[in-house]
Curated annotation (Swiss-Prot):
GO terms for cellular component: cytosol. PANTHER family: TRNA/TMRNA (URACIL-C(5))-METHYLTRANSFERASE (PTHR47790), TRNA_TMRNA (URACIL-C(5))-METHYLTRANSFERASE (PTHR47790:SF2). This is tRNA/tmRNA (uracil-C(5))-methyltransferase. The lineage of its organism: Bacteria, Pseudomonadati, Pseudomonadota, Gammaproteobacteria, Enterobacterales. Pfam families: tRNA_U5-meth_tr. Dual-specificity methyltransferase that catalyzes the formation of 5-methyluridine at position 54 (m5U54) in all tRNAs, and that of position 341 (m5U341) in tmRNA (transfer-mRNA). Belongs to the class I-like SAM-binding methyltransferase superfamily. RNA M5U methyltransferase family. TrmA subfamily. It comes from Salmonella arizonae (strain ATCC BAA-731 / CDC346-86 / RSK2980). GO terms for biological process: tRNA methylation. It catalyses: uridine(54) in tRNA + S-adenosyl-L-methionine = 5-methyluridine(54) in tRNA + S-adenosyl-L-homocysteine + H(+); uridine(341) in tmRNA + S-adenosyl-L-methionine = 5-methyluridine(341) in tmRNA + S-adenosyl-L-homocysteine + H(+). SUPFAM superfamilies: S-adenosyl-L-methionine-dependent methyltransferases. CDD domains: AdoMet_MTases.
Length: 366
């Protein structure tokens, strides 16, 4: 695979290899055949980052070969959304001959939605001044005149210039209901929107007969907790990043959800609070004992759950675990399988044509 060519004819074979690999990895914990969720074969990534290469008068996006580290020119990127591909050409055309925009530009980041909104961030090794702002405003207006719903941001050391806003609002159809998700530039969002819809619908399906409340750790912008709110009496969710917490609060209001509470704290801190080890001012007014959480949802970073959180989640009758790294999932399962059984297993092809796998497991207490 190269950045400008996807081996779409090999999609089925690469997916089958992942299914076999996941089943083998999970064999010590479950004999289940994974439920498999396919990605679109192209134009599935909603965000992308490129370095910029200045070659005389020419200017173009580049990526680096992961093995050789050699530079690869990228004029089109079929893994990314159609909107990103359109913007890549439009941005180069708008920046190439404009000194204020081109000088010391080293990277462009693209974030798009299925609702055809975009935030484009231009990263510089220079101080951004009023001349840059005027040139960027003119470029933004020219892009909008082409029918592109785009917002531009300039970034440099200790500097961030928003021409109007640093977010876009995604709209996803999830199990018969449209969900609105504010996505903030430079914050984590699910990269494959079509796969995100399938993950949300799978999570809804496996928790459809739930009792009591839901606790979620690492909730981000509320991606899962807001969609799952319809299956539970109440949802209590934690997140550490301020922009993500602010986006989650907006998303709660935008979706008219009244049974979700977001707390800004790390999973490790929440574990301490639940165990009565420490008290936190951020929990004032929230009585944790009022929540009857029979299900806990975790979507941890690639490192998986730390040992203290492992112990904490074992106290819940049901654990819903979304993993972007099955190796650390299996490491966690060495502990979790002592008290819980894997009752559902799913593979989500979040990153086609790569080694990476995303998977979900539902664990029920023995």
């Amino acid at each position: 695979m190269t950045p400008e060519h996807l081996p779409t004819e090999q999609y089925d074979a690469q997916l089958a290899e992942k299914v076999a690999r996941l089943q083998s990895m999970m064999a010590p914990f479950s004999g289940l055949v994974p439920e498999v969720f396919r990605s679109p074969a192209s134009h599935y990534r909603m965000r992308a980052e490129f370095r910029l290469w200045h070659d005389g008068d020419d200017l173009y996006h580049i990526m680096f070969d992961q093995q050789t580290k050699s530079r690869i020119r990228v004029d089109s990127f079929p893994a990314a959304s159609q909107l990103i591909n359109t913007l890549m050409k439009a941005m180069i055309a708008g920046v190439r001959d404009n000194h204020a925009l081109r000088h010391k530009l080293f990277q462009i980041d693209y974030l798009t939605t299925l609702s055809n909104q975009a935030v484009v961030s231009l990263l510089y090794h220079k101080k951004l001044d009023e001349e840059w702002r005027e040139a960027a405003t003119a470029l933004r207006d020219a892009l909008r005149a082409q029918g592109l719903n785009v917002h531009l941001i300039g970034r440099a050391t200790k500097t961030k210039i928003e021409l109007d806003q640093d977010y876009i609002d995604e709209r996803l159809p999830v199990a018969g209901k449209e969900m609105i998700y504010r996505q903030v530039e430079n914050s984590f969002t699910q990269p494959n929107a079509a796969m995100n819809i399938q993950m949300l619908e799978w999570a809804l399906e496996v928790t459809k007969d739930s009792k009591g409340d839901l606790l979620e750790l690492y909730c981000g912008n509320g991606n899962f907790s807001l969609a799952l709110a319809r299956n539970f009496n109440r949802v209590l969710a934690t997140e550490i990043a301020k922009p993500s917490v602010a986006a989650a609060q907006y998303n709660i209001a935008a979706n008219h959800i009244d049974n979700v509470q977001i707390i800004r704290m790390a999973a490790e801190e929440f574990t301490q609070a639940m165990n009565g080890v420490r008290e936190f001012n951020r929990l004032q007014g929230i009585d944790l004992k009022r929540y009857q959480c029979e299900t806990i949802f975790v979507d941890p970073p690639r490192s998986g759950l730390d040992s203290e959180t492992e112990k904490m989640v074992q106290a819940y009758p049901r654990i819903l675990y979304i993993s972007c790294n099955p190796e650390t999932l299996c490491k966690n399962l060495e502990t979790l399988s002592q008290t819980h059984t894997v009752s559902r297993l799913a593979l989500f092809d979040q990153f086609p044509y790569t080694h990476h796998m995303e998977c979900g497991v539902l664990l029920t207490a023995k």
